Amino acid sequence: MQKVFMIYIDFDDTMYDHKYHWRFDEDFDYNIMFGFGKIPYEEKYLNHELVAKVKNIIEENRKKGIKTLVNLLTGCRTSVYFVSKTNFLDEVVPEFFDQYFSVSSQEDKLPMIQAYNKKIEEEYEIVNTLVIDDGFGVTAQCQDVGYEAMAPGYFEKHYELGE
């Protein structure tokens, strides 16, 4: 069975550093504004350092015969917001992500990871699951079940691929 290294990356303030931030009561309006392009995504706010580090992991794993699957895992209240994120990523980092996932809340991220990993285990042997997310609650939940999980700043500066 082929080995696979699973990576899950959050979008907001992990993969993309937002210029604008909003309160929870404004969240729906901002979802719509980004979703309909009233606030455009800009490539300069993409976390290029994170992308480069993940590409290095992909290459190192390839040399060892390990497949790497990179997945976006983001929270979205509206489908137009999700589509605008994925369209932006397809444009600026084509073929970087293997799969895009959207969940309705941060609490749904861990169950989504577990469900997708279970599906992947039908064909592959998972050697590691790495979660990169700016949300402490998400990383703590993932660490509690044995996944590697960290904030983007820590990942970019300190993460080393294990042997």
Segments from the language model and where they lie:
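His/Asp/Glu-enriched short active-site or ligand-binding loop at hydrolase and phosphoryl-transfer sites
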Residues: 97-110, 134
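Short, aromatic/basic amphipathic alpha-helical patches
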Residues: 84-94, 115-119, 141-146
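Conserved Lys-Pro-Asp/Glu-containing loop-to-beta segment of HAD-superfamily phosphomonoesterases
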Residues: 109-137
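Surface-exposed amphipathic alpha-helices with a cationic face
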Residues: 55-62, 117, 139, 143
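Residues at the C-termini of beta-strands that transition into short coil/loop
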Residues: 19, 103-104, 153-154
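Short intrinsically disordered terminal tails
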Residues: 1-2, 163
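Alpha-helical substrate-recognition element adjacent to the catalytic core
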Residues: 2-101
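Acidic, Mg2+-coordinating phosphoryl-transfer loop and its flanking beta/alpha structural elements
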Residues: 126-163
